[in-house]
């Protein structure tokens, strides 16, 4: 299903999230199961299914990473359940450096400073990835779609690093 069509928004990486939220509320009102309480069982079931589609579509389009994955899936590139590993040597080296830095945080004399530095480093790297991703998703070239897939894989890894850093930070506050 093309969620951009469902929400009547232009397929793009950068979307108007306020417009998306407005369309979501409109669709929810139109397909809400309560509106079909006195209808046939089939109508009730269709309403529940449609509500689930609207909810999934909204969650997909409001999240930049999921939105990018959806854009690629519309082009036949599925990333949601893949196990492909990245072959970018520089990125793999950077991953190792970040992992070492995460492990060293608890041994630092000023762990919060290290945490702040890592958040800043992650943010700068992610910003670069997102800029590249937005450019690649505009292109109709299949090679660019494959490069966009690699950017998404990197961003997924960065999300895991963020989660790990947040867990470490929470552990220090306990």
UniProtKB/Swiss-Prot annotation:
Residues 2-74 form the J domain. The keyword Acetylation does not apply. GO terms for molecular function: ATPase activator activity; protein-folding chaperone binding. InterPro entries: DnaJ_domain, HscB, HscB_C_sf, HscB_oligo_C, J_dom_sf. It comes from the Bacteria. SMART domains: DnaJ. GO terms for biological process: [2Fe-2S] cluster assembly; protein complex oligomerization; protein folding. GO terms for cellular component: iron-sulfur cluster transfer complex. Keywords: Chaperone. The keyword Membrane does not apply. Co-chaperone involved in the maturation of iron-sulfur cluster-containing proteins. Seems to help targeting proteins to be folded toward HscA. Interacts with HscA and stimulates its ATPase activity. Belongs to the HscB family. This is Co-chaperone protein HscB homolog. It comes from Shewanella frigidimarina (strain NCIMB 400). The gene is hscB.
